[in-house]
Design a protein with these regions (language model features):
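Bacterial N-terminal signal peptides that target proteins for export
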Residues: 2-14
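Bacterial N-terminal signal peptides
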Residues: 13-23
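Subtilisin-like serine protease catalytic core
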Residues: 31-33, 42-147, 160-165, 175-177, ...
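Extracellular S/T/G-rich loop segment that most often corresponds to the catalytic His/Ser-adjacent loop
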Residues: 61, 218-310
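Hydrolase catalytic cores
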Residues: 137, 273-367
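C-terminal edge strands of extracellular/lumenal beta-sandwich accessory domains
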Residues: 329-330, 334, 339, 425-429, ...
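Secreted peptidase-domain scaffold signal
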Residues: 354-472, 531-540
Length: 540
């Protein structure tokens, strides 16, 4: 393959390698995994004992982490255990060469891996028991999206085809996209590939959000994955969206960036926020480097999936009531992660769902200041998404189990189901809700992307393409239990362009309520699978 300097792709990484100045505190991985970060350490300890055992996750990057037993240069360092490494879809050459671009890519990939699976006692990763498969795509003279798709597909087939989440901590340039007048409209080849693979391989793709001066935003225009912005430490917690993130909203002279740095049609770009500023991370040389960026926020989310999936598999093996194989679905993971994210700190009375932090955006505004809180047509905040990742709250959300709308449902839970065109599913909450308490509800579903499979082998091959079949329009309502008219709902999320709907709203008065999932408009098929997660407060 012809090679070239990785100017565009390494712009993403070089920005992520900013070394903190003396006046800025640097933080070991233990801080971002602790209560000040995503609160995953609590899940590592009794009685939870969740470290991602037997759960396979993946990482696609420009480089790959070195693997003990494959690369001689890491014989003395085993703190970042990698289950399998690949170059695109083949075994890599052992003992990666030490030219500068390869070294940078290797270090970046190892630091991303460290966030997920590091076993170092002072810098333990989010899911040190998980099985990580990693693929590097290498240096390409042109747009590398086809090879990146091949690598992602190959990872999705590892572990017997059972990978629960795949991390992407790099971006592709719109300028190198071969489409004429390419824009962030969801139809770049890599973006379509991820949305196709999410459905076909049932894997959650976690994508590092756009940052810095932008310029490498593909595949943040995906529909079926999760895009991650990064937070910085503020008053002792990771609770402020870093100014280096590129969000969704552009106004004034910056409207020229719509479609280039943010999605067309005001579709939300950021799903969730995770720690990523001034982290001290490990490489397999035993070196610790201070890094910042969405590259290191995204793997916090990917590895949290491994913790949740270990719990889910434990429940399935014990045949626990309210647990089915739906617990493994990527849509369920997306709904659970987004619905349990921190927005505004609870005052100790539980009315704000036990949230542990006030997340702040530009100008110190919080989620209640956002257009997403005020407008039913905007499900997520442009900077903050649904809020800040909290692994323990995600566990609480997930551990409540799956509940069918066939009978009244508890205050906390999730479901995976289908809804027919022009129909709806009503989830009636069994207990009255407390006046003044917040309700959080998240609905997720997939855009349909199909493979133009010229040779009929059901796999993407170089030279093939994808077809966008569109996005069915689902809406979400919180309504009085006896009401049937959605115009009388107390809160709604009715975006016409997003594949996520989200409600976060205070209950106006104590009473019985229900959640409605409504199929508003069909783009392709008669039924639409979806995942739903809800968190409410029963009356006292």
């Amino acid at each position: 393959v012809p090679e070239r300097p990785l100017l565009n792709k390494f712009a993403w990484m070089v920005g992520a390698f900013a070394v903190a100045g003396a006046s800025i505190p640097t933080l070991g991985l233990s801080s971002s995994v602790s209560e000040a970060g995503i609160n995953a350490q609590r899940l590592h300890e009794p009685p939870y004992n969740l470290i991602g055992r037997k759960i396979a996750i993946g990482a696609v990057d420009i480089g790959r982490p070195r693997k003990f037993g494959w690369d001689k240069s890491v014989q003395n360092h085993r703190e970042i255990p990698v289950q399998g490494v690949f170059f695109q879809d083949t075994l890599p050459k052992p003992n990666a060469v030490e030219e500068l671009p390869e070294t940078m890519a290797q270090e970046h990939a190892e630091q991303v891996a460290a966030v997920m699976v590091s076993s170092d006692k002072t810098s333990r990763g989010v899911a040190p028991g998980a099985k990580l498969y990693a693929a590097g795509v290498g240096r390409l003279e042109r747009n590398g999206q086809p090879e990146e798709c091949v690598a992602a597909q190959h990872l999705a087939g590892q572990n017997g085809g059972d990978l629960r989440a795949i991390n992407l901590s790099f971006g592709e340039s719109l300028e190198q996209d071969p489409r004429p007048n390419a824009r962030l409209d969801g139809n770049a080849l890599l973006t379509q590939c991820l949305d196709w693979s999410a459905r076909v391989h049932d894997v959650l793709y976690v994508v590092a959000g756009n940052q810095g001066s932008g310029g490498i935003p593909i595949p943040t225009d995906n529909y079926n994955g999760v895009n991650v912005a990064f937070s910085t430490l503020y008053e002792g917690m990771f609770r402020k969206v870093d100014l280096a993130n590129v969000g969704t909203d552009f106004s004034g002279v910056l409207t020229r960036l719509v479609g280039k740095e943010s999605n067309v049609n005001n579709r939300r770009l950021v799903s969730i926020v995770a720690p990523g500023s001034n982290l001290e991370l490990l490489t397999l040389d035993g070196q610790r480097t201070v890094t910042s960026g969405t590259s290191f926020a995204a793997p916090h989310v990917t590895a949290t999936v491994a913790l949740l999936q270990e719990y889910g598999d434990r429940q399935l093996s014990q045949k626990t009531p309210q647990w089915t194989l739906d617990a493994r679905r990527h849509q369920v993971m997306k709904a659970v992660l987004l619905n349990s994210a921190d927005k505004i700190k609870d005052q100790g009375d539980g009315l704000r769902l036990g949230m542990g932090r006030d997340l702040l955006g530009a100008g110190n505004r919080n989620w209640l200041d956002s257009d997403a809180y005020k407008s039913p047509e905007i499900p997520l905040d442009g900077e903050m998404g649904s809020g800040h990742l909290d692994a323990f709250r995600a566990y609480q959300q997930f551990s409540a189990g799956q509940w069918s709308p066939a009978q009244a449902v508890p205050a906390l839970g999730w479901d995976y189901r289908e809804v027919s065109d022009k129909s709806y599913q009503d989830y009636v909450l069994e207990a009255p809700l407390q006046s003044g308490s917040f309700v959080a509800v998240t609905l997720t579903w997939n855009r349909l992307v199909e493979l133009n499979d010229s040779n009929g082998n059901k796999q993407y091959d170089l030279g093939e393409s994808f077809a966008d079949r569109g996005l069915n329009d689902l809406n979400l309502y919180l309504m009085p239990a006896e009401e049937n008219n959605t115009s009388k709902s107390i809160s709604a999320s009715t975006s016409q362009v997003d594949s996520t709907e989200h409600i976060f709203f205070p209950v106006p008065k104590t009473g019985r309520y229900k959640i409605r999932v409504q199929y508003a408009k069909s783009a392709f098929e008669g039924t639409q699978p979806y995942a739903l997660a809800w968190w409410t407060v029963p009356s006292r």
